[in-house]
């Protein structure tokens, strides 16, 4: 085992177990062993497929959106490993190509490859949603960062930030030309990136989208069509928080739905908070994660919310990036309004609850 793999195994027990069981296999052999692990459908799985189809239709049309839903219906597996951002970062590209390969091993054509991605990272996340990553370069860290968004917006959340504007693209291209003149990247790479910016980022398809969240869906579909010389698949990215918010609204309309029981019945809610305390993707007491939902403020900054109960009423409370106290009543109406106006974002627990536990999709 290489030094890097040894360090990986030491820091990540799950990776160590994976290497122990499958370290001697080829990628194709390993991919061939992955499959849906059925659970009972507690709520209709077609609800999720309807929301997927409805989300993609305005971007790609009824036929492509329908094929995306059909692929998920047949395979019952959701790729949820990636942050929602224009896919320049190398691990993201590798992961999406592996998912494409897995679907083709299952007998799919690979023309449409669906992804559910997490839109809660900040722009300064290590996958660099703030701009483009260039790997053909002489930078000491092995990649060159070309920002679209100014430094002052580095703490803004991908889910809430405005889209990449033509001025942002022009600024990035000016920086790219400077770096090429310095020899930081090859002229061939600089030419390819400039062509991409003009043909994709400045296209009507991308610029008609008002938010980075929407633009990412279009950009990544156009990017993936350039990955291969013999085929032009569309990798269709949907923010999992968007899908979860729409499913929650469906659930809230049914009084007996388990989601509402978990959120609004005091005894069940208290048991859930205790059981998931310290679990990855959930919360750790009052110090880590968030209780069910994140808050989003007018700076597009994400902040945690904590459940508080007083006089029999429950509310989510927190402090935003401006130092203001925020209180959201834990009611169907307040949560629905917050999800619609963008002041609330679903946490990972609710995202996986809706897709995996309630509607039987392997994630």
Predicted regions and their residues:
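Glycine-rich phosphate/pyrophosphate-binding loops
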Residues: 103-124, 363
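Non-transmembrane, aqueous-exposed alpha-helical and coiled segments at domain scale
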Residues: 52-78, 106-109, 311-363
């Amino acid at each position: 085992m290489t030094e890097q793999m040894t360090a990986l195994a030491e820091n990540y027990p799950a990776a160590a177990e994976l290497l122990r069981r499958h370290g001697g296999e080829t990628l194709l052999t390993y991919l061939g062993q992955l499959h849906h692990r059925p659970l009972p459908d507690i709520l209709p799985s077609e609800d999720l497929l309807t929301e997927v189809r409805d989300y993609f239709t305005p971007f790609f049309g009824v036929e492509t959106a329908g094929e995306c839903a059909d692929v998920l219906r047949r395979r019952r597996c959701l790729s949820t490993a990636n942050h929602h951002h224009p896919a320049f970062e190398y691990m993201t590209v590798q992961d999406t190509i592996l998912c494409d390969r897995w679907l083709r091993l299952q007998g799919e054509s690979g023309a449409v490859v669906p992804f559910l991605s997490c839109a809660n990272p900040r722009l300064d996340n290590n996958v660099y949603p703030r701009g483009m990553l260039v790997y053909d370069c002489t930078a000491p860290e092995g990649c060159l960062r070309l920002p679209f968004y100014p430094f002052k917006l580095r703490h803004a959340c991908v889910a809430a930030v405005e889209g990449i504007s033509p001025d942002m693209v022009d600024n990035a291209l000016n920086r790219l030309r400077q770096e090429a003149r310095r020899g930081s990247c090859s002229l061939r790479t600089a030419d390819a990136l400039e062509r991409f910016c003009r043909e994709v980022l400045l296209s009507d398809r991308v610029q008609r989208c008002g938010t980075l969240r929407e633009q990412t869906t279009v950009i990544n579909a156009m990017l993936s069509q350039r990955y291969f010389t013999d085929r032009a698949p569309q990798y269709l990215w949907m923010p999992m928080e968007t899908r979860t918010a729409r499913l929650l609204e469906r659930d809230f309309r049914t009084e007996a739905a388990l989601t509402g029981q978990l959120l609004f019945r005091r005894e069940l809610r208290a048991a859930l908070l205790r059981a998931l305390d310290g679990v990855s993707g959930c919360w750790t007491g009052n110090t880590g994660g968030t209780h069910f939902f994140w808050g989003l403020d007018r700076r597009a900054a994400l902040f945690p919310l904590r459940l508080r109960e007083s006089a029999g009423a429950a509310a989510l409370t927190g402090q935003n990036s401006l130092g203001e106290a925020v209180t959201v009543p834990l009611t169907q109406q307040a949560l629905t309004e917050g999800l619609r106006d963008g002041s609330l974002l679903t946490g990972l627990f609710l995202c996986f609850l809706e897709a995996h536990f309630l509607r039987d999709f392997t994630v």
